[in-house]
From Swiss-Prot:
Residue intervals on the Cytoplasmic side: 46-53, 121-139, 218-237, 293-314
InterPro entries registered for this protein in UniProt: GPCR_Rhodpsn (IPR000276), GPCR_Rhodpsn_7TM (IPR017452), Olfact_rcpt (IPR000725), Olfact_rcpt_6C-like (IPR047132)
Organism listed in the record: Homo sapiens
Entry-linked Gene3D superfamilies: Rhodopsin 7-helix transmembrane proteins
Protein name per its UniProtKB record: Olfactory receptor 9A4
Record function comment: Odorant receptor.
Glycosylated residues, chain numbering: N4, N190
Any one GO CC term of the record: plasma membrane
Localization terms from the record: Cell membrane
Organism placement in taxonomy: Eukaryota, Metazoa, Chordata, Craniata, Vertebrata
Keyword Cell wall biogenesis/degradation tagged: no
Family per similarity comment: Belongs to the G-protein coupled receptor 1 family.
GN (gene name): OR9A4
């Protein structure tokens, strides 16, 4: 049970080091990243919904991935921006900390489940194109997305519940810009070895449960693409899969550092650097990764801009 320590009711987010002037510069940079992230991912969701050329499983999954990117950055960045404007440390109450950590982990878990599904979708499209529409039909896609969302949110209930049954009596200063799990474990005066081991096993299950199908499917995809006789066909297939692979490398690399370690408090002081990759950089890059290398999306964007210009003229 929670004890009556100040850390059990509120925490102080240490945020970023540096002067007030540096904080204002960082605020401008991250605010720009946040706006571009919101606009870019919203545009992807809109064109996937309205453009008939993008009515396929690949773009259906991409629309949901963009929604998840908006959520994960919105859970973290507004709080971080507010902290950059305030002098000193930022106070966050226990209830807000619980909600933030749960939503962050739940959305992240959902995203990895969806990335695994996207890898399987690309495998079927490249390696079994004649049966693609039969296997990846609308019912299958809706079911996969629903399972990903439900799994992501249900899977993180127990880990977050356990985190806030610990007693935080060492300190209530979190060396991060949000309620980071590794930092919270460092502040606990309980013996957290067993808890950390269970959290490690759960992280391994989520990340490798998604990463292994991704690696296997990409291996099959590459071997299939290399058998395509025309160079233009190979180039087009590689371009389609490269965007997904780029997103996978950034996302998995960051989260493997953050969560796949037996002792969660190990190197926890560097978590804020990698957390920036997950919550700021990856959602920012997502629209560029999936649009600049995709001819269909570029054409849909171009036509959408033309229609908007015509509406304004009229």
């Amino acid at each position: 049970m929670l004890m009556n320590y100040s850390s059990a009711t509120e925490f102080y987010l240490l945020g970023f080091p540096g002067s007030e002037e540096l904080h204002h510069i960082l605020f401008a940079i991250f605010f720009f990243f946040y706006l571009v992230t919101l606009m870019g991912n919203t545009v992807i969701i809109m064109i996937v919904c309205v453009d008939k050329r993008l009515q396929s499983p690949m773009y259906f999954f991409l629309g949901h991935l963009s929604a998840l990117e908006i959520l994960v950055t919105t859970i973290i960045v507004p709080v971080m921006l507010w902290g950059l404007l305030l002098p000193g440390m930022q106070t966050i109450y226990l209830s807000a900390c619980v909600v933030q950590l749960f939503l962050y982990l739940a959305v992240g878990t959902t995203e990895f489940a969806l990335l695994g599904a996207m890898a399987v979708d690309r495998y079927v499209a490249v390696c079994n194109p004649l049966r693609y529409n039969i296997i990846m039909n609308r019912h299958t896609c809706n079911f996969v997305v629903l399972v990903s969302w439900v799994f992501g949110f249900l899977f993180q209930i127990w880990p977050v519940y356990v985190m806030f049954q610990l007693t935080y009596c060492k300190s209530n200063v979190v060396n991060n810009f949000f309620c980071d799990r590794g930092q919270l474990l460092k502040l606990s005066c309980n013996n957290t070895l067993f808890t950390e081991f269970i959290l490690f096993l759960m992280a391994v299950f989520v990340l490798f449960g998604s990463l292994i199908p991704t690696i296997v499917s990409n291996a099959y995809i590459i071997s299939t693409i290399l058998k395509i006789p025309s160079s233009s066909g190979r180039r087009k297939s590689f371009s389609t899969c490269a965007s997904h692979f780029t997103c996978v490398v950034i996302g998995y690399g960051s989260c493997l550092f953050l969560y796949v370690k037996p002792k969660q408090t190990q190197a926890a002081d560097y978590n804020w650097v990698v957390s920036l990759m997950v919550s700021v950089v990856t959602p920012f890059l997502n629209p560029f990764i999936f649009t600049l290398r995709n001819d269909k999306v570029i054409e849909a964007l171009r036509d959408g801009v033309k229609r908007c210009c015509q509406l304004f003229r009229n």
